């Protein structure tokens, strides 16, 4: 059923565009535009652990935060026909960026609202992040000064982090928050990677007045497939956790404003907000010290939200 639904979603722009105008479709291979921009990426990504044997309550959460990572972003769009456009876009970080990670556990089932263990890692790096997007648009309105259309596409994004050093407050079996200390500076504590794969649908449009232009895009997916990999490097607790979550929700809103410095060239600024909401999924672990493994259904949660700001140049050939 989901495969049939997805097929309908992906063909929607083509079907609508074929009925949106009574004019004959014409092939316009020369109508291509490309843009390039520089900007920053900020946000937070979260991983959660749940215990099914305790009613699925949350027992652990790691928050990975990053701010103002430099990125380069680009896109190319081809108006294949007046009613149909295809495009490709993507961005990548230009280098690693400092961040912060907080790891909290709630191990006391009799007091589930109070954390028992916490570690803080201000020496955290966003190693890299990137994204690519392939899409097709069907234009319901396509006039020289305004456009409005439906879109569908496929998008993937990746994030990688490493936390080093830091401090901790743990609870022993006999006490509560009674074990306080720090990790060696520069020593790897945890490495974490997230990946999101999603087909999506959306709405996009723009409006031009003289040399000024405003545009916006909304995207939604209910078919996100998220996966992650968590490496605990502590020699006494060398464990790899892997999780997979299906059918998460994704929302994205993008707004841009630009000015045409020539008939074909536009400078612009843009802001984009993205969010993948939390949902439970399956997780597995492998203990490297004693060579044992375990699997838990609905034992993990994955979440991500970020904000991108860019400034760039768009040129129509």
Curated annotation (Swiss-Prot):
Provide the GO MF annotations for this entry: aspartic-type endopeptidase activity
Segments in the Extracellular topological domain: 42-69, 93-130, 157-197, 222-250, 275-306
Q: Which positions make up the signal peptide?
A: 1-20
Q: Which PROSITE patterns match?
A: OMPTIN_1, OMPTIN_2
Going by the record, the broad EC class of this enzyme is: hydrolase
Q: Name one GO biological process term.
A: proteolysis
Q: Membrane topology type, per the record?
A: Multi-pass membrane protein
Q: Name one Pfam family in it.
A: Omptin
Describe the reaction catalysed, as an equation: Has a virtual requirement for Arg in the P1 position and a slightly less stringent preference for this residue in the P1' position, which can also contain Lys, Gly or Val
Q: Tell me which parts of the chain lie in the Periplasmic compartment.
A: 21-31, 79-83, 141-145, 210-211, 262-264, 317
Segments traversing the membrane: 32-41, 70-78, 84-92, 131-140, 146-156, 198-209, 212-221, 251-261, 265-274, 307-316
Keywords noted in UniProt: Aspartyl protease, Cell outer membrane, Hydrolase, Membrane, Protease, Signal, Transmembrane, Transmembrane beta strand
Known activity regulation? Inhibited by zinc.
Q: Where in the cell is it found?
A: Cell outer membrane
One GO cellular component assignment for this chain's record is:
cell outer membrane
- Its Enzyme Commission number(s) read 3.4.23.49
Annotated active site = 103, 105, 230, 232
Q: Which family does it belong to?
A: Belongs to the peptidase A26 family.
SUBUNIT field: Homopentamer.
Please explain the role this protein plays, according to its UniProt record: Protease that can cleave T7 RNA polymerase, ferric enterobactin receptor protein (FEP), antimicrobial peptide protamine and other proteins. This protease has a specificity for paired basic residues.
Q: What is this protein called?
A: Protease 7
* Gene responsible for this protein: ompT
